[in-house]
């Protein structure tokens, strides 16, 4: 089931933002999936299909991405956290039972949500995401990456090839929409650059130290989350579970969804043995 959830910002007169949400329904424990920068909720389809028999799986397009409001006025980390909280409230996901799974930038949102709202989150899964920073060159890097896209793409096959081929390339191509001359992205370049401005000036270790729920960190052997950062996360927060998918890249949830499912399922079996996976 898909629906649009309207969320409100802080402060009088803040414009509403519309979030495109997919909800499997059901009575199982809630699993909320957060995609990375410039992505879309459909990236989680393969993983969601594996969890739907036992969990209520929810995913939504982040503000500025996919079918959600494309040019929101506020793209701060705090705004993304409010979105998670308001989606959970709108769908009446039970407080204290929510499992947050976030990849890359979605993982930062998940981390900050767990730190700020311990009453809401039962467990946290960070996929290729960690609290290191600041990253001063990140806005420029993201802008150059988006500028390199040969828009419009003539067709889905060409787009998938540009994005590296395979399941990951096809998923990125699936995030495009028809427009003049071919396929176009559903993100605005300047909005994406603004979204990472906060990362250029700070790290998130303070939030990491505030997380109280069980945590699984999934690192790809060929990804961007470095072994040293994952080790430091475990050192600062004993009990953190670290899993490595050796032959996958940063989009490990697309490269090897079966491996990610196995790691998450094993983690959840420890967190809540009564919830069958």
Please place each PLM-identified region on the residue numbering.
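Conserved serine/cysteine hydrolase catalytic core
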Residues: 182-236
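Catalytic histidine-centered segment of alpha/beta-hydrolase-like enzymes
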Residues: 248-257, 261
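Alpha/beta-hydrolase fold catalytic core
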Residues: 1-31, 53-55, 93, 265, ...
């Amino acid at each position: 089931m898909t629906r649009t959830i309207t969320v409100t910002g802080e402060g009088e007169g803040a414009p509403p933002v519309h979030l495109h949400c997919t909800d499997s329904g059901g009575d199982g424990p809630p699993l909320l999936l957060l995609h990375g920068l410039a992505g879309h909720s459909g990236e989680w389809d393969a993983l969601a299909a594996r969890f739907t028999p036992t969990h209520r799986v929810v995913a939504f397009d982040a503000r500025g991405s996919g079918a959600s409001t494309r040019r929101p006025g506020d793209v701060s980390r705090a705004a993304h956290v409010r979105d998670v909280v308001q989606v959970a409230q709108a769908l009446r996901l039970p407080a204290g039972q929510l499992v947050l799974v976030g990849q890359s930038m979605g993982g930062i949102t998940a981390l900050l949500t767990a730190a700020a709202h311990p009453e809401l989150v039962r467990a946290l899964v960070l996929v290729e995401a960690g609290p290191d920073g600041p990253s001063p060159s990140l806005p420029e890097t993201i802008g150059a990456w988006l500028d390199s896209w040969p828009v419009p793409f003539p067709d889905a096959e060409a787009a998938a090839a540009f994005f590296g081929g395979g399941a990951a390339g096809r998923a990125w191509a699936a995030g495009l929409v028809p427009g003049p001359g071919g396929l176009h992205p559903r993100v605005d370049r300047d909005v994406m650059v603004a979204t990472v401005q906060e990362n250029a000036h700070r790290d998130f270790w303070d939030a990491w130290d505030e997380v109280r729920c069980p945590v699984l960190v999934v690192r790809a052997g060929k990804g961007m989350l470095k072994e040293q950062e994952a080790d430091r996360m475990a050192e600062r927060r004993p009990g953190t579970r670290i899993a490595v998918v050796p032959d996958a890249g940063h989009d490990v949830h697309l490269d090897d969804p079966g491996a990610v499912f196995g790691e998450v399922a094993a983690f959840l079996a420890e967190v809540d043995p009564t919830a069958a996976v």
